[in-house]
């Protein structure tokens, strides 16, 4: 069967309603066009439609405050020795609502992966970090709690470019990072473009997301850990070879529960549906599920990797074998690799999945043609 026909069969039911949670209403002090964004805000602030702002250093939204970003806003991080990032603390909100043709763009003065620090949102939803609380990798802000319906606001039609600033060997900034974010938050139609770390990362929480695109993120396109249990619908990851973008890209999905305690509760168990993952034919790993993570995958295509799907750790493989985790209609360009030989490629096929399919994509256009949710100009490629 041709690749496009595979896409069409998977995405025929890919029409979905808008977020029913979150808050889009703005209100507050309007920041003039051309202003510099820096420091901490403690009251409601509005970045007005079509305006351009400079981000210089940290920009922190404190508990009780709301940062409203209207359609068409451009935030440009200053390129110097000071790391630039946006941090939304517990109890604060960000309402960033663009449109498909008037996208909110967060970028850098220098069009280079790793130029700035991205956006970090901390919520009160549960996580399996030690003691149920954690500190954000960027900004050292607390996250976690027991409010799984917590609402940190809205992100719609937002693109983050050239993030991934390296603080040290252990800490690099993703494009979008969600720390203990609850399912009262709305995230849809967002893109991570040419970052030097992950595109989207989830540290616990219950946030649901849809219509996400990660292009040429040099670490993982999608990454989760610490007990993320949300739903993700319509995900795309696309990687080009190093001789095109100037660097290699790692996993398309990297899935963990907790690296220090594979059985930590709550266990990571997201539900992913309608997913297209295209690798760069350079690095090996495509979908890597490990360290006790559970998952439900349905209607997925993964290709362009030597090891398109790898399952690691006894806990992860037993969850698949016992149908706690599920894979259905997952189409892979090569066999599933089982580290512990518990959930084998034969079991994978028995569960209604397919391997060794010829799946080749010459450009992002091949993906866009079969994703009717990628319309307008909000996706850059």
Language-model regions, residue ranges each:
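Positively charged n-region of N-terminal signal peptides that target proteins for export
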Residues: 1-5
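Sec-dependent N-terminal signal peptides
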Residues: 7-10
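Glycine-rich loop(s) and the adjacent beta-strand/alpha-helix scaffold that form part
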Residues: 102-103
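Extracellular beta-rich repeat passengers
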Residues: 23-67, 78-93, 98, 107-197, ...
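Short active-site-proximal "capping" loops at secondary-structure junctions
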Residues: 74-75
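C-terminal motif of bacterial Sec signal peptides marking the signal peptidase cleavage site
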Residues: 15-18
